[in-house]
């Protein structure tokens, strides 16, 4: 690194328990060269990492999150395991599910200029990140399978079908239990409206 440069890291507190077993990963080759060190450490699975990032990209629409999505599409892509993890994060999210699946796109130009431009080795224009955002929404809605849709609707009904996704410990996840408690407190008319909006978004 150049003299006088600095590295900023973010510590993220995660309320949500992991969906898949952790993995041990080595520091990538480029970072080993840049920082002149080697590290191997246990991490969340790729599906858990990107499942949460997908929700963040749809919710905040921050250029950093959209850049991560661009890297995902350029490498692993939206795998079935990653998509399943995303569905669980989506079901656990504070925002209504239909709002993340069909988001109102924000103008990110100012945030891009003030909080992202110059952060990456490869210059990525704001237009490319907006294209990634559109692709993310399209890919998710096109590829959600019947079991994933059924699980999301069952959560919104307050009658979870825990076996729908084939993930063993879903009923033990605190975030899902908290979401179900909140749904249970909703007035019946509002819950019905929210369910109908989700079903419409999912084309059910």
Q: Which residues does each PLM region occupy?
A:
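Compositionally biased terminal segments of proteins
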Residues: 1-204
């Amino acid at each position: 690194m150049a003299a006088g440069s600095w590295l900023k890291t973010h510590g993220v507190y995660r309320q949500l328990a992991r969906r898949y077993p952790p993995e041990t990963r080595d520091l990538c080759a480029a970072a080993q060269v840049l920082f002149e060190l080697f590290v191997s450490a246990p991490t969340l699975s790729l599906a858990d990492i990107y499942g949460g990032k997908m929700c963040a990209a749809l919710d905040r629409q921050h250029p950093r999150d959209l850049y991560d999505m661009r890297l995902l599409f350029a490498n692993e892509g939206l795998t079935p395991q990653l998509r399943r993890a995303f569905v669980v994060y989506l079901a656990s999210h504070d925002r209504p599910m239909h709002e993340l699946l069909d988001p109102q796109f924000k103008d990110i130009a100012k945030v891009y200029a003030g909080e992202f431009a110059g952060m990456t080795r490869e210059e990525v224009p704001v237009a490319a990140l907006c294209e990634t955002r559109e692709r993310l929404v399209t890919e998710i809605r096109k590829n959600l399978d019947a079991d994933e849709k059924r699980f999301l609707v069952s959560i919104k009904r307050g009658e979870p079908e825990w076996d729908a996704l084939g993930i063993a410990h879903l009923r033990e996840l605190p975030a899902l239990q908290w979401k179900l408690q909140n749904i249970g407190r909703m007035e019946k008319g509002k819950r019905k409206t929210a369910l109908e909006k989700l079903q419409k978004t999912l084309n059910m």
